[in-house]
Regions:
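Phosphate/pyrophosphate-binding betaalpha-module
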Residues: 135, 139-170
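Metallocofactor- and cofactor-centric catalytic cores in central/energy metabolism, strongly enriched
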Residues: 1-129, 143, 153-155, 164
């Protein structure tokens, strides 16, 4: 988008917010991810909102708030020759206490970026000699697709797929 298009979009959104907001009413909106919080602050959006609309910083996205213990477990699995880590790309740079998946990958760890959890099934079939460890991370809204994947793995009779789970509750 050009700067003019961005300005037009912002103006349109602000007009809609002002039209929907009832004077004297308090509306609280939660920005869930720390990246959103930074963007809102940097762009000065808080100051543009009418009084009565409050922005509340939330818990942080599951990736941003992943603890080092979880990452250290993932790294320990990644360092095993008999293991492939299946993960979403945004997990690659999350630091553990001594490394990250991205760094481990440069040292020869088998890290496979996936776009949907169900990809672990094909990965498992392609590499039956390897243990496939899926880093199942997300909010409670993503649990259903993880459960569907667990069920599909079970129904396919795959014995080499494992789930390292860390879901967050909003």
């Amino acid at each position: 988008l050009t700067l003019q298009e961005k300005q037009h979009t912002a103006d349109t959104l602000l007009r809609r917010i002002n039209a929907l907001h009832e004077p004297g009413e308090t509306v609280r909106l939660m920005e869930v991810c720390g990246t959103h919080t930074v963007s809102i602050f940097r762009e000065g959006l808080r100051q543009l909102l009418p009084s009565g609309i409050e922005l509340v910083s939330g818990p942080g996205c599951p990736v941003c708030v992943t603890d080092q213990t979880y990452m250290d477990k993932a790294l320990a699995y990644a360092e095993r020759e008999d293991t492939i880590i299946a993960t979403f790309g945004d997990m690659l740079k999350v630091p553990g206490s001594y490394s990250s998946l991205s760094e481990a990958q440069t040292k020869g760890a088998h890290i496979h970026v996936i776009y949907t959890p169900l990809e672990v099934i094909e990965l498992s079939k392609k590499h039956p000699e390897k243990k496939i460890v899926f880093l199942a991370i997300g909010f409670e809204t993503t649990i259903a697709v993880i459960c569907a994947t667990v069920k599909a793995v079970h129904e396919a009779g795959l014995k080499n797929v494992f789930f390292l789970v860390s879901h967050k509750l909003v």
